[in-house]
Design a protein with these regions (language model features):
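Sec-dependent N-terminal signal peptides
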Residues: 4-13
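Asparagine-centered strand-capping/turn motif at beta-strand->loop junctions
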Residues: 65-69
Length: 168
């Protein structure tokens, strides 16, 4: 009986630890009718403007993102661990000829997404843009802690394409 109790407690502990990654406190997709303000963001080659964001806890923000750089860039709301876990997906997209330096092969992306959903890059916390493209994200910063906005295109995060998010 004691061994069974230890096994159950150990399983519960490890399951809650493992599932914590999937439920990291970064907020959630927001609704347009709840937007409190709009922040315009420009993505240059390996930096964002603005370079940091001050956001009130619980606030819903509409990010209007424009890639003014010469390379493909990503605007991704997550914490450091989530960015690191997302980077192999982005590398796989590059290895499969989907993610190129100056463009995204959307036809290949659609085909790959049928086999591997992560290759569709349809995350609600992220937008992947070619040069001169615009996109938007509506995000609710509820229970959000340790957030950073980063580009996970191979090499860009490592080059410092990260913006700090201060939750007040």
């Amino acid at each position: 009986m004691k061994k069974l109790l230890i096994l159950i407690l150990t399983t519960l502990f490890f399951n809650s630890f493992c599932y914590a990654d999937k439920n990291m406190k970064i907020g959630s997709k927001g609704n347009l009718n709840e937007v409190s303000r709009t922040i315009k963001v420009k993505m240059y080659d390996n930096y964002y403007e603005p370079s940091s964001f001050s956001i009130e806890a619980g606030e819903t923000i509409k990010f209007e993102v424009e890639n003014v750089g010469m390379l493909v860039h990503e605007f991704n709301i997550a914490n450091k661990m989530m960015h690191i876990k997302h980077q192999p997906e982005m590398s796989k997209m590059a290895e499969n000829g989907i993610l190129l330096a100056f463009s995204i092969d959307k036809e290949k992306m659609k085909k790959m997404a049928k086999m591997d959903k992560s290759m569709g890059h349809s995350h609600s916390n992220s937008v992947l843009l070619e040069p001169k493209q615009k996109g938007e994200i509506i995000w609710k910063f509820i229970n959000a802690v340790n957030i950073e906005i980063a580009c996970n295109v191979p090499g860009h995060y490592q080059a410092g394409m990260i913006a700090k998010v201060n939750i007040n």
